[in-house]
């Protein structure tokens, strides 16, 4: 019975665990990003999408969304990636259409 209770407690805890946004292993939080970030989506041939993120760091063109260990994270689609950022507290503030595609300026929701 204790094992079942422990298992249920661990499962319930995992439901409330939220993913966090990392760029090259650096966690994005208000102290290091401010209110805005810029996303540059990069598409693969299979339709998956990665994002380069500019949050004010010194070399933004080489910084991708990663897990906490620095491994690059690919999303199933552009919308999947934008939904991920929305769930993490960001919303689209502006969309810029450039020669090589769209750029998304995101603003912190809270």
Q: What residue ranges belong to the model's regions?
A:
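N-terminal signal peptide c-region/cleavage motif recognized by signal peptidases
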Residues: 12-16
